[in-house]
């Protein structure tokens, strides 16, 4: 399985920010403490499933995992819409087909960019481009396709999970929407030195299409 640990993600973020901070110090002689705005992008698709205690249920399954062929084929036929293997809903349905124990405990399902944004702001949101790699988007409403959401929920209703699909997916935002601000915890996560101040506005987390 292609994966990255939460430790890898955290340390990668910190290394990236430390590089930016050092660059500012070298060029301008100033310690970076504030930014006008910020945003995050990451590899689209994949599968990061969390329980109600915000614990990761299974290792992060990245878009590179081609292990969802059965789910992708069935969903593509059911929804009359091409669902590639890398899409989050394909990973979710494959886990259901395999009767993976963790599925019943899912409280939140997101992507890498969505996870980073959530940890830094507390907001469970995605930009519409990134969200389109989780589940089909209705171009009129700029939100998840409600007809397809219902079709999926009907497909799995006999499983009697304690969740509905839309309730575990991130809220969809478009460019310019308020997506939260950097929290105190997020600032410390990004810059363990404590120099970075909270309160910086963030744009919706996006992917290839954002």
Predicted features and spans:
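Short acidic-aromatic active-site loops that bind/stabilize oxyanions
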Residues: 2-10, 81-85, 171-176, 200-204
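ATP-dependent carbohydrate kinase catalytic cores
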Residues: 138-210
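Glycine-rich phosphate-binding loop plus the immediately following alpha-helix
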Residues: 64-100, 115, 135-151, 157
């Amino acid at each position: 399985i292609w994966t990255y640990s939460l430790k890898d993600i955290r340390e990668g973020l910190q290394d990236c920010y430390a590089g930016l901070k050092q660059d500012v110090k070298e060029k301008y002689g100033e310690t970076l403490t504030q930014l006008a705005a910020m945003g995050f992008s990451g590899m689209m698709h994949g599968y990061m499933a969390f329980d109600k205690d915000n614990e990761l249920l299974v290792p992060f399954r990245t878009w590179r995992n081609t292990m969802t062929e059965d789910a992708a084929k069935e969903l593509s036929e059911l929804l009359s819409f091409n669902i590639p293997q890398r899409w989050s809903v394909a990973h979710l349905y494959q886990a259901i087909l395999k009767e993976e124990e963790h599925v019943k405990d899912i409280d939140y399902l997101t992507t890498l960019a969505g996870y980073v944004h959530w940890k830094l702001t507390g907001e469970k949101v995605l930009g519409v481009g990134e969200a389109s790699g989780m589940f089909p988007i209705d171009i009129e409403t700029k939100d998840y396709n409600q007809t397809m959401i219902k079709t999926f929920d009907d497909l799995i209703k006999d499983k009697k999970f304690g969740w509905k699909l839309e309730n575990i997916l991130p809220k969809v935002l478009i460019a310019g929407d308020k997506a939260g601000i950097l929290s105190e915890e997020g600032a410390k996560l990004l810059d363990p030195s404590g120099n970075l101040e909270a309160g910086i506005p963030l744009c919706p987390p996006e992917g290839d299409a954002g």
